[in-house]
């Protein structure tokens, strides 16, 4: 299981840039899989706590049901537009994919949740991939930077 701390320890500048993009806005997007295998996109809040990427949700939410059935998921930061005059003002976006691991043990939950009586579904992300997309160069081009456990950070230029 790769934790956020693993990303931060191996590539601190990359991790800081990704975290900055995620923390710039309260609401993010999560992709889950419905029972029939079709994708579902939902809104949620994500936090970085205790070296983990963590998120909770309403007890009977569809996304919680999806993740309990199939934990594969992807989280996406908010995406905002650049200035019309200067595309380089675009802050970029980021995403993380992996498996959502539900934390049900009351003692373990206290590492992340302040209210011991909270019963809502709560997950940490077992990270398989982190991607940061931003503009770079002159003329600007889309730069895709990818982190995966045990592999060197790599860049791909999108044409």
Where do the language-model regions lie?
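Structural motif corresponding to alpha-helix initiation and N-cap regions
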Residues: 15, 60-61
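Proline-centered flexible-loop/turn and helix-kink motifs
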Residues: 12-13, 69-71
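Charged, gly/pro-rich active-site loop segments
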Residues: 1-13, 80, 84-159
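A generic structural signal for nonpolar/aromatic side chains embedded in well-ordered alpha-helices
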Residues: 21-22, 67, 112
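Short beta-strand segments
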Residues: 25-59, 65-67, 74-79
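Short alpha-helical functional segments enriched in proximate histidine and acidic residues
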Residues: 21, 74, 132
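Short, conserved active-site entrance elements at the starts or edges of catalytic domains
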Residues: 5-34
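Short solvent-exposed loop/turn micro-motifs enriched in small/polar/acidic residues
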Residues: 23-25, 38-39, 60, 87, ...
